Amino acid sequence: MKVLKIIGKVFGFIILAIITLILATYGIIAYQTSRTQIDYQDEITEYSEKYNVDPILTASIVKVESDFDNDAKSHQGAQGLMQLLDETARHSAEVVGIDYYPEKLNDIDYNLNLGVGYYNYLYNYYNNRKLALAAYNGGVGNVDKWIKQGIIDKNNPDISKIPFDETRQYVTKVEATYDVYKTFYKDSLPDNNTLTNLEQLSYNNFM
């Protein structure tokens, strides 16, 4: 009986530790997200509606990609709010049917038009948010290969099985940010004239 009690206590401690870790992780993400002002709400909403994408998801992608810094540029040369590489942006311009101007990748409207349009193209291709996000970061060719090789289930993708560390972490971050934003913003973003700090929104939603 003593052995069973000890095992029960150890098991209970492990479960408690796991729950605590999950809550702590969510809390850290929520806190970090709440400290960030969300910018360009009107523009994000405009192009999200144009391409039938959840604006909360678009904001989550922008948050992870550039932290709402329109001048952001990665070491690989990705630019703007949605961190578009030249090749990706050029392809997206063809997809959405506009002329391509590489010098405009830091233009807010142009970048969002291409970025949200490209995500919509990926979502329509895979019919799955997680796969579309994985392709946005890791490339369509790689995601198709993982599906073909049976690494990723097209109908029920498991993020933890994504082979690329960067892509796996990227999808995880966007999904986590989306969950946090969805909690506070519900189904739409406030306009640019509204105070958008999540600490204020959390007060309004939960009081």
Task: Label each region the model flagged.
Residues 1-6:
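N-terminal Lys/Arg-rich, disordered targeting/topogenic segments
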